[in-house]
Amino acid sequence: MGIKDIDIKENFGKIVQNMDLKFRKIDDKELLIAIAIDKYKNVLMTAFMDKESLKMTLKTGLMHYFSTSRNKIWMKGEESKNVQKVLEVFKDCDGDALLFIVEQTGWACHEGYMSCFHNKVDLNTGNSTVIGDKLD
């Protein structure tokens, strides 16, 4: 059964209950951590999700997140067209984070890098160096 074959409207409550997720209160919002990696296990990005963005992700098969700075749900790629198609979902042992294996179109980082984790930190100085190339 594929992600788009799920009747989200009818089954969302049951799905979330069965997943035994623990949304944490952050800035008066019930959120959990969402980590996106590609099929090669490269970390692409991390963001927050609320229940509605999780529901939209499961319903559409495309990643939706909750922006704490903009206080709204956004679909990855809604402006850049660099969408993330959900392939698999894993939860962590505490149930307060989800790991999504995604098919990334284009780059994941809004700065034009494949990963948001492109700043390597020198543990002796705390200075960071950009690794990798910007993608056009």
Curated annotation (Swiss-Prot):
Q: Which GO terms describe its cellular component?
A: cytoplasm
Question: What keywords tag this UniProt record?
Answer: Amino-acid biosynthesis, Cytoplasm, Histidine biosynthesis, Hydrolase, Magnesium, Metal-binding, Zinc
Reactions the enzyme catalyzes: 1-(5-phospho-beta-D-ribosyl)-5'-AMP + H2O = 1-(5-phospho-beta-D-ribosyl)-5-[(5-phospho-beta-D-ribosylamino)methylideneamino]imidazole-4-carboxamide
Give the cofactor note text: Binds 1 Mg(2+) ion per subunit. Binds 1 zinc ion per subunit. May play a cocatalytic role and/or a structural role.
Q: Where does Zn(2+) bind?
A: C93, C109, C116
Where is this protein localized, as stated in its record? Answer: Cytoplasm
Activity regulation info: Reversibly inhibited by EDTA and free zinc ions. Enzyme is inactivated by dialysis against 1,10-phenanthroline, which is a zinc specific chelator.
Endpoints of the signal sequence = none
Q: Which GO terms describe its biological process?
A: L-histidine biosynthetic process
Instruction: List, alphabetically, the InterPro entries matched.
Output: PRA-CH (IPR026660), PRib_AMP_CycHydrolase_dom (IPR002496), PRib_AMP_CycHydrolase_sf (IPR038019)
The main location class comes to: cytoplasm
Pfam families with a match to the protein in the record: PRA-CH
The GO terms this record gives for MF are: magnesium ion binding; phosphoribosyl-AMP cyclohydrolase activity; zinc ion binding
Recorded effect of pH on activity: Optimum pH is 7.5.
Q: Which residues form a coiled coil?
A: none
* Pathway, per record: Amino-acid biosynthesis; L-histidine biosynthesis; L-histidine from 5-phospho-alpha-D-ribose 1-diphosphate: step 3/9
Q: Which residues bind Mg(2+)?
A: D92, D94, D96
Which cofactor(s) are needed, names only?
Answer: Mg(2+); Zn(2+)
Q: Might you give the EC number(s) for this enzyme?
A: 3.5.4.19
Q: Give the family per the record.
A: Belongs to the PRA-CH family.
Q: How does it assemble?
A: Homodimer.
Q: What does this protein do?
A: Catalyzes the hydrolysis of the adenine ring of phosphoribosyl-AMP.
Q: What is this protein called in UniProt?
A: Phosphoribosyl-AMP cyclohydrolase
Report the source organism: Methanococcus vannielii
Q: Which lineage is the organism of this entry classified under, starting from the top rank?
A: Archaea, Methanobacteriati, Methanobacteriota, Methanomada group, Methanococci
Q: Which gene encodes it?
A: hisI
